[in-house]
């Protein structure tokens, strides 16, 4: 599976993953809205929005 792995609003980059899902985490801090993308579907702390999906590059 191919997942996007760029941070926040950086240009799109992808990585090949062994997992069958991709994730996109969104949260706010003193720098504004932060976005992290990657492979799998991790546990997150309260206050962090997590979206998991199961198709190539679905987490852009």
UniProtKB/Swiss-Prot annotation:
One GO cellular component, as annotated: extracellular region
Pfam families registered for this protein in UniProt: Toxin_cobra-type (PF21947)
Molecular function per GO: acetylcholine receptor inhibitor activity; potassium channel regulator activity; toxin activity
Disulfide pairings: 3-22, 17-39, 41-52, 53-58
Subcellular location(s) of the protein: Secreted
Known tissue expression: Expressed by the venom gland.
Gene3D superfamilies, per database record: CD59
Swiss-Prot/TrEMBL keywords: Acetylcholine receptor inhibiting toxin, Disulfide bond, Ion channel impairing toxin, Neurotoxin, Postsynaptic neurotoxin, Potassium channel impairing toxin, Secreted, Toxin, Voltage-gated potassium channel impairing toxin
UniProt-listed InterPro entries: Snake_3FTx, Snake_toxin-like_sf, Snake_toxin_con_site, Toxin_cobra-type
Recorded family membership: Belongs to the three-finger toxin family. Short-chain subfamily. Type I alpha-neurotoxin sub-subfamily.
Role description: Binds to muscle nicotinic acetylcholine receptor (nAChR) and inhibit acetylcholine from binding to the receptor, thereby impairing neuromuscular transmission. The recombinant protein also barely blocks voltage-gated potassium channel Kv1.3/KCNA3 (2.71% inhibition at 60 nM of toxin).
Protein name (database record): Short neurotoxin 1
Organism encoding this protein: Hydrophis lapemoides
Phylogenetic classification of the source organism: Eukaryota, Metazoa, Chordata, Craniata, Vertebrata
């Amino acid at each position: 599976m191919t997942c996007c792995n760029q941070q926040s609003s950086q240009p799109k980059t992808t990585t090949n993953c062994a997992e069958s899902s991709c994730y996109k985490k969104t949260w706010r801090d003193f720098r504004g809205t932060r976005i992290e993308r990657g492979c799998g579907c991790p546990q997150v702390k309260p206050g962090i929005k997590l979206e998991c999906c199961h198709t190539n590059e679905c987490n852009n």
